[in-house]
């Protein structure tokens, strides 16, 4: 009787382990290593096309398309931007322009949660009327968890136009 009980427990555990392995293999998830490979390929392609890529101290990559004028955005400033957000494969996941006029803006206070770290960091390299492409690694975005339609370990690419900077009073 003891042998049958032990056999049942071992068989059950092995069945559960086998089933969980099948489920893991059936789901294609981006890993951190895959993200880094894809990011490197993306940056290499941008450089090969003549883009000058800079990096913030935290690790956000950016390309200044139009420098803009005035002072750089600072924590506490109220910013108005137009943006389009893409996955690194070019698929758009969001835009301030979707479903509205081309003059739509997204207004927020810089460094005021719930922004992602890479977004806030990227805003600080922009002046009024600047246009910048931000390339934000997942470690500065939604990381290993993802969020909503953003999968885990997903580099985010934003094209941002800084429409206005209202300094903190």
Please provide the spans of the model-predicted regions.
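Cross-family detector of peptidyl-prolyl cis-trans isomerase
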Residues: 2-8, 17-169
């Amino acid at each position: 009787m003891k042998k049958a009980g032990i056999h049942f427990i071992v068989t059950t555990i092995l069945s559960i382990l086998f089933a969980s392995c099948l489920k893991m293999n059936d789901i294609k998830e981006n890993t951190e290593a895959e993200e880094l490979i894809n990011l490197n390929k993306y940056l290499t392609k941008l450089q090969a096309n003549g883009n000058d890529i800079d990096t913030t101290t935290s690790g956000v990559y950016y390309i200044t398309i139009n420098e803009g004028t005035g002072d750089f955005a600072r924590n506490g400033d109220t910013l108005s931007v137009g943006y389009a957000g893409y996955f690194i494969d070019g698929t758009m996941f969001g835009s301030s322009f979707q479903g509205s006029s081309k003059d739509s803006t997204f207004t927020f206070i810089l460094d005021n949660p719930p922004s992602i770290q890479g977004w806030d960091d990227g805003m600080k390299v922009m002046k009024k009327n600047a246009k910048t492409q931000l390339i934000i690694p997942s470690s500065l975005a939604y990381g290993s968890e993802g969020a909503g339609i953003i999968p885990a370990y997903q580099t985010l690419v934003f094209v941002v136009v800084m429409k206005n900077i209202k300094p903190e009073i």
